[in-house]
Amino acid sequence: MSRPENPSALHILAFVYLTFSHVTDGVLAPEELDTIARVLQGWLPDAAPAVIQRVLVESAAWVNEFADDDERLAKAEEYADLMRQQMNEKQRQAVLVNLILLARADGQITAREESFIARLTAILDHA
């Protein structure tokens, strides 16, 4: 499996959230996966849970296609720039709040999580 043929906005959000969880502490804890599913559902409240699950599976395969974390981070930053251009301020803030929720999901916030959030904040808040 590879990059979804026509990735939706939800796929892109899932990619960023999964990349965050993958590269910041190296382990995707069950609590983090549950939180990702919940925040994705918040973006598309009427979606069936099976749709959210499919997006997660496809996006996880996509994240795993990259050779290393540097490539994953570069792509996540590219998508953050796209979000900055296409989302309103409230939506961009929601992305950042969701990252904070993910950081807290496993009960510990690491320096790498703080650094990732700071980097995406700088990108998303750049006018």
Where are these regions (language model features)?
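Small-residue-enriched hydrophobic alpha-helices in membranes
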Residues: 1-23, 27-127
